[in-house]
Structure formats: structure tokens, C-alpha cells
């Protein structure tokens, strides 16, 4: 497995992966890294938006067959190492308990709530939990 910055040529495959994982596809202005298998096919990606000393985690997607292998953790650490944020924020579906557990393991804490934030295919809406990560100060 290789982690590398995504290129414009990767975007179609990442958009397909995003749809399969029910997350927003990365945009051309986002900072995106992907984890690829030996053939170069994307297994996972993380998309972030840095602003000053903060980072917004916009999307984190892992192919179902590639989950529970540490890809999300490795991608998150790659983004943190590259962007060096003091603080990071994200929104996650209230029903996505697996993602919430992952984010808690990565050091995120519950920070707020957004009512009716996510649209559902049936026209209903779902709440989002806002989570916050804080860098550990180094001396």
C-alpha cells in the first residue's frame, strides 16, 4: 500500500469511491491524499481544507473490502503531518457510529450538533455531530 497526494487524474476514481462510501467527493481545491494498492487503484482517500492553523476534514472514505487495515488512521496522520494544524474539525452523520468510533480513536471529541445537516436519498434529513481534534503541544 502506498499513500500519496492525489492528482487531477485520480479524481474520477475518487469520486466513484466517494459515492460508494456515501461521502462527498473531493473538490479540486481540497488537499487530498489517497492510499493505493500495488496496481495503483485507490483503496481510500482523505480530503481536507486547511485555513490558517486549522484543518477541516471534509471526507474520509475507505473501500469496504479494505476497512479495518489502518488506512484511515494512516491517511489522517499523513494529513496532520503535512498540514500541521493546531485544531481540526469535521462533521459526521449522527447514525454513523463506526466513523464516530474511529474519530474518537484518532483523538476527536464531540463539539457540537447540526440539525438536519445531511440530505438522505428519501428526501429526509439527518443530523450531524461536529467533532474537534486538538494538537498536543510539543515543547
Which positions does each model-derived feature cover?
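Acetyl-CoA-dependent GNAT
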Residues: 2-69, 73-82, 133-138
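Residues lining the SAM
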Residues: 54, 58, 91, 100, ...
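Short glycine/proline-centered loop/turn elements that form peptide/ligand docking sites
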Residues: 72, 76, 96-99, 116-122
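Structural motif
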Residues: 83, 105-106
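Conserved GNAT acetyl-CoA-binding A-motif
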Residues: 83-94
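Conserved catalytic-core motifs of GNAT/GCN5-like acyltransferases
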Residues: 89-91, 109-130
Amino acid at each position: 500500500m502506498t499513500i500519496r497526494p492525489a492528482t487531477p487524474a485520480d479524481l474520477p476514481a475518487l469520486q466513484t469511491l466517494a459515492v460508494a462510501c456515501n461521502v462527498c467527493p473531493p473538490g479540486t481545491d481540497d488537499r487530498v491524499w489517497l492510499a493505493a494498492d500495488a496496481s495503483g487503484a485507490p483503496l481510500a482517500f482523505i480530503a481536507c481544507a486547511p485555513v490558517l492553523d486549522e484543518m477541516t476534514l471534509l471526507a474520509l472514505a475507505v473501500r469496504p473490502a479494505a476497512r479495518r487495515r489502518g488506512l484511515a488512521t494512516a491517511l489522517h496522520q499523513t494529513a496532520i503531518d503535512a498540514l500541521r494544524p493546531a485544531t481540526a474539525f469535521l462533521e459526521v452523520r449522527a447514525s454513523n457510529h463506526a466513523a464516530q468510533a474511529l474519530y474518537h480513536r484518532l483523538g476527536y471529541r464531540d463539539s457540537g450538533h447540526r440539525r438536519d445537516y445531511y440530505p438522505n436519498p428519501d428526501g429526509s434529513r439527518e443530523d450531524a455531530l461536529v467533532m474537534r481534534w486538538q494538537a498536543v503541544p510539543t515543547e
